[in-house]
Structures are given as structure tokens and as C-alpha cells.
From Swiss-Prot:
Belongs to the MIP/aquaporin (TC 1.A.8) family. NIP (TC 1.A.8.12) subfamily. One of its GO terms (molecular function) is channel activity. A motif (NPA 2) lies at residues 238-240. It comes from Oryza sativa subsp. japonica (Rice). This is Aquaporin NIP3-3.
Length: 278
């Protein structure tokens, strides 16, 4: 029962934040000059860059102070984890009223609204695995990685203790614990995190992607992954989600699986799309 309930878990998102305000001015200048130029005079490469910049203007944060970015990551992670854990607890307390589909929907909707709300501030990672992958491929300054991860973990821990205080005693089902063998659990978490980052990277970096649908696509991917992997591993995809619930309940069963498999899956998913991108 515990393994099944923990299967309705959380996730995260991410769009690479812009590094400097100067870069924003360059983008605006380039887009402005190219928009007034005769399309026939633009090379294919220039048109491609123009399309890319026009798409990015709506989703890449401008130069935002690091304090505001990490604050957005803290509050966003808190909202996400609080929503997911509360939904799981309601399902347990009311005889599976939510069901796996309901919990997956709750997590997917939470991710969707948070991406729409925070993407322009921090990129809305809410997940150390995403931040690590973004840093590895140069989309997040290395100096920002530790502050991002710290704020995400603190947000998840705070949300887990808030849930524990409100619904005490908390059922251990909120903890992500494998309901399959260790090797199987490792690869399940690796694969679903791979899926998540493959989609995020495609939408965030491909000029041909429909950028207005990023929030919906990422939320739908989270929902899909929970439906696929929830009953077997808890479908964490997010080290912060796993750490927060583990600390709040004092249960650390096979926690290393989630701390190792998810970052590796995130890096692999991002790398896979980078390799095939046109």
C-alpha cells in the first residue's frame, strides 16, 4: 500500500535563465533590426536566429537579482511539494478518493501554473536534477547552482513539515520508497527523469518549438510519468521532493536511488535532445 501511495509524487520544471541584462539588450536590438528588414534579404541562418530570439523573449528571465531567483525557487518548490503531498494524504484519508489519476493531475496542474507564474523570474526549475542538467549544458551559471539547489531543498523540507504539522500524524506513504527491486527502481527513475528533461530541453532550446505551450507540455509530462511510474517508485523525478519527505518522516529507505538516478537521467535527457536538435 505504501509503495502504491508514494507513487503519486512530484516533479519540476525548468527553462534556462538569461545570464545578464546586457544579453537581453542585444536580443532586443537584434530582433528589432531584423523585424524591420526585408525577409528576402535575410539569410536562412539570420531568419532562424530571429525566430529563436522572438520565441525566447517571452520565456527567458531578464536580468533578475539572484536573491529574487532563489526566492522564487523556494516558494515555487514549497507550493509544488505542499500540493502533491496534501493530495496524497487526502487520498489516503478518504479511501482513495483522489486515485492515481487524481494525484497525477494535481501534480501536473501544479507544475503548469507554477511555470506560468515563475518562469520569467528564475526559469522555474523547482528541482535540483533540472538545475544540475541546465548547469552542465551551460544554461545556468555555475555560481547559481548551489543557491538554486539549496533553495529547492529548503522549500521541499518546509513544505513537508507544513504538511506534517497540518495532517499529523502523517502517513509514511508520502515518502518515495521503491516498490520494486533496487535496480528496477533506479532505471525507472532514470528513465522518467530522462523523459522530463528531454521535453524541457526541446521546448526551451529549439527555435521550432511552440514556446507558448511549455507550461502545458511540462505539466503533461509530469502527469504522464506519475501514471507510468507512481506505483513502482513514487515517480519522484526530483531529489528535493524525496529529501523533504524523508527528513519530515525520518524514513530514508533506499534514498540514494532517487539522489543518483534523477540527476543522471536529467543530464542524459538534456544531452539526448542536444545531440539530435536540428
Amino acid at each position: 500500500m505504501e509503495g502504491h501511495k508514494s507513487g503519486m509524487e512530484a516533479v519540476a520544471v525548468a527553462i534556462p535563465p538569461l545570464h545578464t541584462g546586457e544579453s537581453n539588450h542585444r536580443i532586443d536590438s537584434n530582433v528589432s533590426s531584423q523585424c524591420h528588414a526585408d525577409p528576402a534579404e535575410l539569410s536562412d541562418e539570420t531568419q532562424q536566429q530571429s525566430l529563436w530570439h522572438l520565441g525566447l523573449r517571452k520565456i527567458i528571465p531578464s536580468s533578475v537579482p539572484l536573491l529574487k531567483k532563489v526566492s522564487a525557487e523556494f516558494f515555487g518548490t514549497f507550493i509544488l511539494i505542499f500540493t502533491v503531498l496534501s493530495t496524497i494524504i487526502m487520498d489516503e484519508q478518504h479511501k482513495s478518493i483522489e486515485t492515481l489519476l487524481g494525484i497525477a493531475t494535481s501534480a501536473g496542474l501544479a507544475v503548469t501554473v507554477l511555470v506560468l507564474s515563475l518562469i520569467h523570474i528564475s526559469g522555474c526549475h523547482l528541482n535540483p536534477a533540472i538545475s544540475i542538467a541546465m548547469a552542465v549544458f551551460g544554461h545556468l551559471p555555475s555560481a547559481h547552482l548551489l543557491p538554486y539547489i539549496s533553495s529547492q531543498i529548503l522549500g521541499a523540507v518546509a513544505a513537508s513539515f507544513a504538511v506534517k504539522g497540518l495532517y499529523h500524524p502523517v502517513n509514511p506513504g508520502i515518502v518515495t520508497v521503491p516498490n520494486v527491486g533496487t535496480v528496477e527502481a533506479f532505471f525507472v527513475e532514470f528513465i522518467i527523469t530522462f523523459f522530463l528533461l528531454f521535453i524541457i530541453t526541446a521546448l526551451a532550446t529549439d527555435p521550432n518549438a511552440v514556446k507558448e505551450l511549455i507550461a502545458v507540455a511540462v505539466g503533461a509530462t509530469v502527469m504522464m510519468n506519475i501514471l507510468v511510474a507512481g506505483p513502482s517508485t513514487g515517480a519522484s523525478m526530483n531529489p528535493a521532493r524525496t529529501i523533504g519527505a524523508a527528513i519530515a518522516t525520518g524514513r530514508y529507505t533506499q534514498i540514494w536511488v532517487y539522489l543518483v538516478a534523477t540527476p543522471l537521467g536529467a543530464i542524459a535527457g538534456t544531452g539526448a535532445y542536444v545531440a539530435i536538435k536540428l
